[in-house]
Amino acid sequence: MKDVIYVALGGAVGSVLRYWVGIVTIRLFGPFLPWGTFSVNLIGSFCIGLFAEMIARKFDASADLRMLLITGLLGGFTTFSAFMLDTVSLAERGDLLWPAFYVAASIGFGVGAVFAGLAVGRWLF
C-alpha cells in the first residue's frame, strides 16, 4: 500500500508541474507547436537518468524513492499519449514536415537528455 501512496504523491506533483510547463510554454512561444509536451519529455528524460543514478548511488537503490520519483513524479510529468496526440494534430494540418521534425527531435533529444542525466548523476553521486 505504501508504494501506491508514493506513486500517487509523486504523480500528483508531476501532473501539476506538467500543467505549469504547458501554460508557460504557450505564453512564451504560442500554441503553434506543442512545446509543453516537447519540454516535459526532454526534462523528464534528463531527470530519469539523473534520478536513476542518484537512487542507485546515494540511496542504496531505494524502492520507495524509485516509486516516488521515477514511477510517480516522472510518470505524472511526462506523457507518451500527449506526444502521440500532438504528432497527429500536427499531421492533420496537412504538412508532414512539422510532425516528422517533432518526432525526430523528441526522440533524438530525449535519448541525449537521458545520457546527460546519467552523466550528471554519475558526476554528482
UniProtKB/Swiss-Prot annotation:
Biological function: Fluoride-specific ion channel. Important for reducing fluoride concentration in the cell, thus reducing its toxicity.
Organism field: Allorhizobium ampelinum (strain ATCC BAA-846 / DSM 112012 / S4) (Agrobacterium vitis (strain S4))
Pfam families per the UniProt record, alphabetical: CRCB
Annotated positions binding Na(+): 75, 78
Keywords: Cell inner membrane, Cell membrane, Ion channel, Ion transport, Membrane, Metal-binding, Sodium, Transmembrane, Transmembrane helix, Transport
GO biological process entries: cellular detoxification of fluoride
Activity control: Na(+) is not transported, but it plays an essential structural role and its presence is essential for fluoride channel function.
PANTHER family with a match to the protein in the record: FLUORIDE EXPORT PROTEIN 1-RELATED (PTHR28259), FLUORIDE-SPECIFIC ION CHANNEL FLUC (PTHR28259:SF18)
Alphabetical list of NCBIfam families matching this protein: crcB, PRK14195.1
Catalysed reaction, written as an equation: fluoride(in) = fluoride(out)
Signal sequence extent: none
Transmembrane segments: 4-24, 32-52, 68-88, 100-120
Cystine bridges: none
Presence of keyword Transport: yes
Molecular function per GO: fluoride channel activity; metal ion binding
Membrane topology according to the record: Multi-pass membrane protein
GO cellular component assignments: plasma membrane
Protein name: Fluoride-specific ion channel FluC
Keyword check for Manganese: no
Source taxon at top rank: Bacteria
Cellular localisation: Cell inner membrane
Primary location class: membrane
InterPro entries: FluC (IPR003691)
Similarity remark: Belongs to the fluoride channel Fluc/FEX (TC 1.A.43) family.
